[in-house]
């Protein structure tokens, strides 16, 4: 599954680069955002550990007059892990802006861990966009935005949700509870409630009970919209300090797999010479 995902992701990234009219010889700066000392936030730095960087080789060859010895099937790539302001005392954007101004890459790829709004998305999806990224915004610690408008070069942001807050966990629990109730009532023709396990492959939406049933079991909370429920839960949990940010207990091994997946896909997409055999 990881290999299949890597192949699909690398192909989609190639298409994205083509869509942005980024040429094969365009220089790239890969930025790994996040705190390397906090596992679920270390996606960016971990990805950089396996990125093939070549900019220094081009610089050395240029000084020694040996550019003709460089394999043009390897793009000029550099990498940067700016850390977080709590460790460096410097705004992440300022570090990136300075490096971009000095090295002048043609485009940026920024990798970061995200906060999910649903438990089902944690470590299960890859987000890719050309609209930039605001570091820390998912956990209420918004920093200055990193995008094409502010830096003057195309910015492709890649993220994987690795954490989720208690509001989302509680919201999803209520939603799943309602679907369990709906399934039980449907199987018993509405005469008796008896819980049974829902298969992960089931279409859960089909089990969502009617508004009247939701109100019967949960009162006014049962008829609130998704956003209204989120807002209510946030108003209850946040002031009490209970809106914790959580991550799966298997995060160490999953981060190792996910970071390797992303770095391998980036290497294939950025360097035409690189291929992975099945």
Predicted regions and their residues:
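Extended, charged alpha/beta regions that create polyanion-binding interfaces
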Residues: 1-25
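Conserved active-site and cofactor/substrate-binding residues in soluble primary-metabolism enzymes
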Residues: 4, 8, 42, 46, ...
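Gly/Ser/Thr-rich loops at beta-strand to alpha-helix junctions
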Residues: 33-41, 86, 113-117
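A structural signal for small-residue-enriched, beta-sheet-centric alpha/beta enzyme cores
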Residues: 80-81, 110-277
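Proline-aspartate-enriched helix->loop->beta-strand connector
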Residues: 100, 105-106
């Amino acid at each position: 599954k990881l290999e299949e995902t890597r192949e699909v992701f690398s192909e989609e990234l190639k298409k994205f680069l083509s869509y942005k009219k980024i040429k094969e010889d365009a220089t790239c700066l890969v930025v790994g955002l996040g705190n390397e000392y906090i596992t679920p936030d270390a996606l960016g730095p971990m990805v950089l550990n396996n990125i093939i960087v070549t900019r220094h080789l081009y610089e050395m060859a240029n000084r020694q007059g040996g550019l003709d010895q460089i394999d043009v099937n390897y793009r000029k790539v550099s990498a940067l892990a700016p850390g977080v302001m709590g460790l460096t005392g410097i705004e992440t954007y300022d570090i990136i802006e300075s490096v971009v101004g000095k090295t002048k890459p043609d485009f940026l790829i920024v990798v970061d861990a995200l906060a999910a709004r649903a438990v089902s998305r944690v470590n299960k999806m890859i987000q890719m966009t050309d609209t930039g990224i605001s570091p820390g915004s998912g956990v209420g610690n918004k920093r200055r935005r990193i995008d094409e408008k502010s830096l003057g070069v195309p910015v492709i942001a890649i993220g994987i949700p690795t954490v989720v807050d208690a509001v989302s966990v509680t919201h999803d629990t209520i939603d799943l509870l309602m679907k369990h109730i709906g399934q039980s009532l449907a199987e018993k023709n509405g005469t008796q409630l008896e819980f049974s396990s829902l298969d992960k492959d089931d279409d859960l939406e089909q089990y969502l009970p009617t508004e009247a049933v939701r109100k019967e079991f949960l009162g006014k909370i049962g008829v609130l919209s998704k956003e209204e429920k989120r807002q209510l839960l946030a108003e209850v949990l946040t002031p009490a300090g209970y809106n914790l940010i959580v991550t799966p207990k298997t995060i160490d091994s999953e981060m190792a797999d996910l970071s390797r997946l992303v770095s391998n896909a980036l290497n294939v997409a950025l360097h035409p010479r690189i291929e992975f055999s099945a």
